[in-house]
């Protein structure tokens, strides 16, 4: 993604943050209205940003989010957590429990507690309804229209609108930032308390804010203050440090975190979002110089992923074997081995490993999905379909699973069912026009099973409702 494109996307979603943050005049947005706007935002994000939705990445970030929510308590929304490709150091909480993490933020992290601290902070924004409470019913329609305009900006044709947004928001800079600072303090306070309840080390909040301060200082000359969703890290850092000092006697209750899963997740994200030569250099330096054993070992995992991406499969397997020797009980590394074998076209070896791995952990959707792909490539489409349906039930918004199902049906000559699955694939890829086109065809095709026709009709009706109401 180019620097201009990244800045444009950042501008769009920061404008979204501010657009939903006007001071309350009368009544706050209702839960139903917030959920509807959240759905619209998610479709826009899917269209304009690349979501890293591989099952292992998705399951990890959502599992961590669920751990935080267990101490938060019952919520109005079903929270969903996403990783999006952007080199920006940022995360944001959209309405209705949608929380997005930029890959640039994940790159800056070094341990799981840092990620949990940001997760908890963003959940704090949502539970406090910082966005929804500032939009009154009298401005709901114009704010919803503004969301559509913001989605248009993300397409790269801002025109007059960008100048209009910049000028009007700059004029209201002080009040917008004043409210934002209050929200940040409340979210930090909630995050700190939840981390204590989880026995996580809240010093990670301090570490993240120091990193944010460094990056903000570095970029401040290029990014106006009113374009920052999380302003004033200096004040936040002072506040968090005072909390740490106040609770310093509780440090013995903090549990040491196993960072294996985080480090694996981090490299899985980075290998898809950063320059591979630069990442290789980083891994080599970490392997040679880092004093933390897990960080050093998992740098070799990063090298294995890089070799696999460069189709140096033998070298990748050699690197991974060294990592497996240091973590012999980590089943996910066996899945990673099978994925490299799959990429190399060694399907029989990959299948044997994946069968055993899925048997050990049937909840691992990454292993299950990769096994389905191997079965399909080997001509075992019946079993592949069964496995893919399992993944689809567990991850109903994962687009690639519907693409694979559509391919199977198309190869069987079942074009109607293929169009149905292709419609869902396009839907969750953010390509609404193509989704509607294929779902309409599937709905009219008499060869398509009735339950699929009904689901297509339901999706089309929901899309029409969202577009009409927002």
Locations of regions flagged by a protein language model:
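Catalytic Zn2+-binding segment of zinc metalloproteases
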Residues: 113, 123-140
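Hydrophobic or amphipathic, alpha-helical segments that drive membrane association/targeting
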Residues: 2-92, 173, 215-220, 282-283, ...
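Membrane-active amphipathic alpha-helices enriched in small hydrophobic residues
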Residues: 140-158, 163-175
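Acidic/histidine metal-binding catalytic segments
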Residues: 57-58, 77-80, 135-144, 162-164, ...
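Short pre-active-site segment immediately N-terminal to the catalytic Zn-binding motif
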Residues: 103-117, 179-182
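Short alpha-helical catalytic segment bearing the HExxH-like zincin motif
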Residues: 100, 114-122, 126, 166
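Extracytoplasmic and endomembrane cell-envelope/extracellular-matrix remodeling and assembly machinery
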Residues: 27, 39, 51-53, 59, ...
């Amino acid at each position: 993604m180019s620097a201009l494109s990244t800045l444009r996307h950042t501008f769009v979603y920061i404008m979204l943050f501010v657009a939903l943050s006007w001071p309350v005049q009368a009544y706050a947005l209702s839960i139903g209205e917030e959920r509807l706007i959240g759905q619209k935002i998610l479709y826009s994000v899917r269209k304009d940003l690349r979501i890293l939705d591989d099952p292992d990445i998705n399951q990890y970030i959502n599992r961590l989010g669920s751990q935080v929510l267990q101490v938060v308590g019952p919520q109005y929304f079903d929270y969903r957590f996403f990783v999006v490709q952007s080199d920006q150091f940022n995360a944001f909480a959209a309405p209705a429990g949608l929380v997005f993490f930029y890959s640039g933020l994940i790159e800056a992290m070094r341990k799981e507690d840092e990620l949990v601290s940001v997760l908890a902070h963003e959940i704090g924004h949502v539970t406090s309804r910082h966005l929804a409470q500032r939009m009154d019913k009298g401005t709901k329609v114009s704010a919803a229209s503004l969301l559509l305009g913001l989605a248009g900006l993300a397409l790269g044709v801002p025109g007059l609108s960008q100048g209009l947004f910049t000028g009007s928001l700059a004029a209201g800079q002080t009040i917008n930032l004043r409210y934002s600072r209050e929200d940040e303090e409340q979210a930090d306070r909630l995050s700190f308390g939840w981390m204590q309840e989880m026995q996580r080390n809240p010093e990670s909040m301090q570490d993240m804010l120091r990193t944010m301060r460094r990056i903000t200082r570095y970029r401040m000359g290029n990014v106006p203050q009113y374009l920052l969703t999380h302003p004033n890290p200096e004040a936040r850092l002072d506040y968090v440090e005072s909390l740490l000092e106040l609770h310093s006697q509780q440090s013995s209750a903090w549990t040491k975190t196993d960072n294996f899963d985080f480090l694996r997740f981090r490299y899985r994200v980075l290998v898809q979002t950063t320059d591979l030569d630069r990442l290789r250099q980083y891994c080599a330096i970490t392997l040679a110089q880092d004093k933390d054993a897990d960080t050093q070992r998992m740098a070799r995992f990063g090298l294995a992923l890089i070799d696999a991406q460069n189709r140096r499969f033998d070298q990748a397997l050699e690197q991974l074997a060294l990592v497996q020797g240091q973590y012999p009980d980590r089943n996910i590394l066996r899945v990673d081995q099978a994925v490299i074998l799959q990429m190399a076209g060694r399907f029989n070896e990959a299948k044997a490993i994946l069968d055993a791995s899925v048997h050990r952990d049937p909840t691992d959707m990454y292993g299950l999905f990769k096994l389905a792909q191997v079965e399909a490539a080997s001509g075992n489409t019946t079993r592949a379909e069964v496995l893919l349906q399992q993944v689809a039930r567990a991850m109903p918004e994962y687009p690639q699973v519907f693409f694979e199902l559509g391919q199977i049906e198309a190869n069987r000559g079942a074009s109607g069912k293929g169009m149905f699955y292709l419609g869902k694939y396009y839907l969750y890829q953010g390509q609404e026009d193509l989704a509607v086109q294929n779902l309409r065809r599937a709905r009219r095709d008499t060869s398509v099973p009735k339950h699929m026709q009904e689901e297509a009709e339901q999706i089309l009706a929901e899309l029409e409702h969202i577009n009409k109401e927002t």
